[in-house]
């Protein structure tokens, strides 16, 4: 009986505490541009993330960019052109690994993009510099690596276990 009373009092306190909490709004907004891998080139891994009520997005992976932005416009997520989202809303890219289903949108859209930072680990950055942005497979839109540097993108290497400030 004593345990039952204690449990009831505990549940009442937890319930009261739950009702007294203020409703918290989401701190971030997420816009999926692509959520798959494989053969569907219009739906490859790419997510825009921004603090709520801003247009300051970082793109987490970049498999699909333009097609995903067009889909987001169609779904009324954005009320501006795809070009404006690409050039002004996306402030940088954070690339998890250099498989094409995670970077093809970054590569293909680089001629139309504005200057921004690409963040990746050393191994990932080396793959992008040596195999994609190398002035042979594709123009080097970066500021490092082989060939002529167009310098559209600043390549910033991330150190595992260290915090990195995202610019812009």
Predicted regions and their residues:
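Zn-dependent metallo-beta-lactamase
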Residues: 3-57, 64-66
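A residue-level structural signature of the nucleotidyltransferase/glycosyltransferase Rossmann-like core
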Residues: 57, 116-117
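Residues at the C-termini of beta-strands that transition into short coil/loop
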Residues: 34, 63, 122, 159
């Amino acid at each position: 009986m004593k345990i039952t009373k204690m449990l009831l009092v505990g549940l009442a306190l937890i319930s009261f505490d739950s009702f007294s909490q203020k409703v918290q709004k989401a701190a971030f907004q997420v816009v999926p541009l692509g959520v798959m891998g494989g053969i569907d080139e219009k739906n490859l891994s790419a997510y825009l993330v921004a603090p709520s009520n801003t247009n300051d997005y970082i793109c987490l992976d970049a498999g699909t960019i333009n097609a995903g932005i067009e889909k987001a416009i169609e779904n009324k997520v954005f009320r501006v052109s795809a070009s404006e989202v690409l050039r002004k809303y996306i402030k940088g890219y954070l690339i998890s690994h250099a498989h094409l289903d995670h970077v093809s949108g970054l590569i293909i859209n680089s001629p139309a993009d504005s200057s921004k930072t690409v963040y990746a680990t050393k191994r990932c950055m080396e793959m992008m510099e040596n195999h994609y942005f190398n002035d042979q497979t594709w123009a080097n839109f970066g500021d490092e690596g082989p060939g002529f540097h167009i310098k559209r993108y600043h390549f910033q290497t991330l150190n595992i276990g260290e915090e990195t400030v995202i610019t812009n």
